[in-house]
Structure formats: structure tokens, C-alpha cells
Swiss-Prot record:
Membrane topology: Lipid-anchor
Protein name as catalogued: Protein Nef
Chain residue ranges for the region called Disordered: 1-70
Self-association state and partner proteins as the record states: Homodimer. Interacts with host CD247/TCRZ; this interaction induces down-regulation of cell surface TCR/CD3 complexes.
UniProt domain comment: The N-terminal domain is composed of the N-myristoyl glycine and of a cluster of positively charged amino acids. It is required for inner plasma membrane targeting of Nef and virion incorporation, and thereby for infectivity.
InterPro entries to which the protein is assigned, alphabetical: HIV-1_Nef_core_sf, HIV_Nef
Cited Pfam families: F-protein
Family, per entry: Belongs to the lentivirus primate group Nef protein family.
Cellular compartment(s): Host cell membrane
Taxonomic source organism: Human immunodeficiency virus type 2 subtype A (isolate Ghana-1) (HIV-2)
Basic residues composition-biased segments: 1-14
Stretches the record annotates as Mediates dimerization: 139-155
Length: 255
């Protein structure tokens, strides 16, 4: 019975990977080498004295999500098909969600530290590391964890840029890292206008292209709160005047 449950869970998680890869740029994706910063093409795939807030109860901030995946055709013969796929993607973004349950399979629950750590390792096995970030992929990940695991989608928020964006949910071990798209990719005529990799930097107020990076140290090092406590507002433990002044200085809106 345990083996059967494991196979079922694996099947659902594989569907997640497939949906993430299909989101604006399936087939092939360029992933950044963690050690040298190089790209390889693969088939898709201090706050002392302050009380650190958990990831529970944070508001879902649609519109904070930035940047998109990258893909280059493997061979010259694929370029026509690739260009057509880019056009098809414009009209078929909802197709990426086919197969997601309409209602959660389990009772809804808030994200907790332990759950965030467990889900982080689970998602890592599905190949999220090095995948380019996009609004669609953000939405797919939220929807998957809501429908399959019952996790209320109010937790996946990251600090503002520029630079590395750290998770505001303590226990979520994924950060968003800015990368430079290669000049060769820039010059590829199939990428002009239609592909999100060319337009993603215009979506980001800082003009950066981001990818997901797994960072196990985030399990005990609450970088978001340590580096940017002002982004937690009233939960930061800072005087209201101080955290508002810091947000204003960084050009971050607040209410």
C-alpha cells in the first residue's frame, strides 16, 4: 500500500514538472551551472532582538512576480517549429494547468516551516533548480501545492530586487537569482519579440532575468528577514516610521 501511494505521488509530481516546463518555453531550457555560471542546454528540465515572522498568513501579492524561462532550439531544423510554438504559447497558457484537480485532494492548510522545508526538497527532485522564473510557473507551483497538498497559496513571496530575491516564507529553500542571458541567445532571430526570455527583463522593474536556486542554508538562515526586515512591515519589529522610510528609500510601495 505504501509503494502504491509512493508511485501515485511520483506520478503527480512528474505532472508538475511537465507543466512547469511547458509554461512559455517547453522542450529545451538553458540552465545555469551553479559552480561556474555557465549555461548548459538540457531537455526540460542583522535581525537580533527582532521577532522573525513565519510564512503563515502572508498576503498573496500578485504583480510582484517577474521574469521568464529561457530556451534555445537544439538544432537549426527546429527553429520553425519553435517559432510557431512561441506563438501558440500566447493563446494556450491555461493548457499548462490541464490535469490539476479542480478541488484540493486534501483539506486546506496554511504553509508551515516544516511543510515548507519538506516541499522544498520534494520540488528539488522534480528539477526546479536552475529553471527560469516566470509568472506562469509561479502560478503553476502555487496551484499544484494547493490542489495536491492543500496548501493555501499565500506564502510564495520574495524580497524585492535588484539582486537575489530571498523567500519571505521561512523554510522555503528557493531563492531567485539574477543571471545574464548569453549574447548568442540575444542574437538568435527566433527569440525576437515572441519569446518571454526577450521580454522578461522589461517585466521586471529592475530589468533582471531570474532563475530558481535551491539553497539549504535558508532552513536556518532567514536571509529575507535579516537583510530586509522592512519588507515585513508591522511584523518586522521595527518602528513604523523606520520601516516605511526604508521602503520609501528603496522605492517599494507600502500601505
Amino acid at each position: 500500500m505504501g509503494a502504491s501511494g509512493s508511485k501515485k505521488h511520483s506520478k503527480h509530481s512528474q505532472r508538475l514538472r511537465e507543466r512547469l516546463l511547458r509554461a512559455h518555453g517547453g522542450g529545451y531550457v538553458q540552465q545555469c551551472n551553479a559552480s561556474g555560471g555557465e549555461y548548459s542546454q538540457s531537455q526540460e528540465g542583522s535581525g537580533k532582538g527582532q521577532k522573525s515572522p513565519s510564512c503563515e498568513g502572508q498576503q498573496y501579492r500578485q504583480g510582484d512576480f517577474m521574469n521568464t524561462p529561457w530556451r534555445t532550439p537544439a538544432i537549426e531544423g527546429q527553429k520553425k517549429l519553435y517559432k510557431q510554438q512561441n506563438m501558440d504559447d500566447i493563446d494556450s497558457s491555461d493548457d499548462d494547468l490541464v490535469g490539476v484537480p479542480v478541488t484540493p485532494r486534501v483539506p486546506l492548510r496554511a504553509m508551515t516551516y516544516k511543510l515548507a522545508v519538506d516541499m522544498s526538497h520534494f520540488i528539488k527532485k522534480r528539477g526546479l533548480d536552475g529553471m527560469f522564473y516566470s509568472r506562469d510557473r509561479h502560478r503553476i507551483l502555487d496551484l499544484y501545492l494547493e490542489k495536491e497538498e492543500g496548501i493555501i497559496p499565500d506564502w510564495q513571496n520574495y524580497t524585492h530586487g535588484p539582486g537575489v530575491r530571498y523567500p519571505m516564507c521561512f523554510g522555503w529553500l528557493w531563492k531567485l537569482v539574477p543571471v545574464d542571458v548569453s549574447q548568442e541567445a540575444e542574437d538568435d532571430e527566433t527569440n525576437y519579440l515572441t519569446h518571454p526570455a526577450q521580454t522578461s527583463r522589461h517585466d521586471d522593474e529592475h530589468g533582471e532575468t531570474l532563475l530558481w536556486r535551491f539553497d539549504p542554508t535558508l532552513a536556518y538562515d532567514y536571509k529575507a528577514f535579516i537583510l530586509h526586515p522592512e519588507e515585513f512591515g508591522h511584523k518586522s519589529g521595527l518602528p513604523e516610521k523606520e520601516w516605511k522610510a526604508k521602503l520609501k528609500a528603496r522605492g517599494i510601495p507600502y500601505s
